[in-house]
Amino acid sequence: METRITKLLGSKYPMIQGGMAWIAESTLASAVSNAGAVGLIAGGSAPIDYLREQIRTCKEKTQNPFGVNIMLMSPNADDLAQLVIDEKVPIVTTGAGNPGKYMEAWKNAGIKVIPVVPSVALAKRMEDRK
């Protein structure tokens, strides 16, 4: 199945698994990616070393696109934002905040960014940052 989303994200199906805290770890994300959708690892307020381990494990288990969900209200959001760049995560989804201050760095790193935002106005501002 080919759609604009599958072309953009490099997946077989236009589906993205939710970044559910305490459930969406490397095992689930890699299984979803191996099935043809986009699996997500929940960043939440995970310690940096733990999330780094989950990202690396996911890379070992799949060659397909996967991502990390970052909750921007997390006290370590800045560190998580840098970690996905350092680990070359292909896709980032965000929630619970405005991802504007990270967009340029993520885009420069080649990361596909999918912000979940509360308003059309903010969505348009994020679109302008592509």
Stretch-by-stretch model annotation:
Residues 1-130:
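Active-site entrance/lid segments in N-terminal catalytic domains of soluble metabolic enzymes
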